[in-house]
């Protein structure tokens, strides 16, 4: 017999979904006010910049992105149109493509981090002590989130961690 979630578990789920949506909306608004493109652009540029060669196959990029991106090909088209990324044909598999970050893309990603990090502090960091943030990461880890990577990635990249 399958067990139904408790009232408390259901309430936690609802809060988690609402808070995630609201915080993302606030971060998006802060980026827009600062004159930057959407967070998905930053996310894609960050992942491309983290790739050892600065390039990835589109499917790899989609898997790595922090924000679910259901129209990765359209996002890549926009990044290419703006000169932030370029497409490159795969020499081994002529049907395959790579997307690589351009120097302009690297510059934008670094500039966006200033506004993005301020938004993270405003909407998350200022509301949680470091001890609370560690506890929250532990709880999210139990749900399958990878918050355990945060210190390593943040220290390495000076960029938002997962």
Q: What is each PLM-predicted segment?
A:
Residues 1-34, 162:
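N-terminal leader segment of winged-helix/HTH proteins
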Residues 1-5, 130-162:
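C-terminal regulatory/oligomerization modules of transcriptional regulators
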Residues 8, 12, 40-41, 104, ...:
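N-terminal positioning helix adjacent to the helix-turn-helix/winged-helix DNA-binding module
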Residues 23, 27-30, 65, 108-127, ...:
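Alpha-helical linker/hinge and terminal dimerization helices associated
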Residues 26-68, 152-157:
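N-terminal helix-turn-helix DNA-binding core of bacterial DNA-binding proteins
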Residues 58, 76-77:
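Short, hydrophobic-biased segments on the C-terminal half of alpha helices
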Residues 77-135:
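Charged, amphipathic alpha-helical coiled-coil/dimerization segments
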């Amino acid at each position: 017999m399958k067990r139904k979630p408790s009232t408390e578990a259901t309430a936690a789920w609802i809060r988690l979904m609402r808070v995630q949506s609201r915080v993302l909306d606030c971060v998006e608004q802060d980026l827009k006010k600062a004159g930057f493109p959407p967070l998905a652009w930053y996310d894609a540029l960050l992942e491309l910049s983290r790739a050892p060669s600065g390039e990835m196959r589109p499917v790899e990029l989609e898997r790595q992105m922090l924000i679910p991106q259901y129209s990765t090909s359209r996002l890549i088209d926009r990044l290419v149109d703006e000169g932030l990324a370029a497409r490159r044909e795969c020499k081994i598999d002529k049907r395959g493509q790579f997307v690589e970050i351009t120097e302009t893309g690297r510059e934008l990603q670094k500039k966006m981090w200033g506004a993005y990090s301020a938004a993270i502090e405003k909407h998350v960091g200022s509301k949680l002590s470091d001890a609370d943030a560690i506890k929250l990461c532990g709880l999210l880890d139990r749900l399958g989130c990878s918050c355990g990577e945060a210190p390593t990635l943040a220290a390495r990249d000076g960029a938002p961690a997962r």
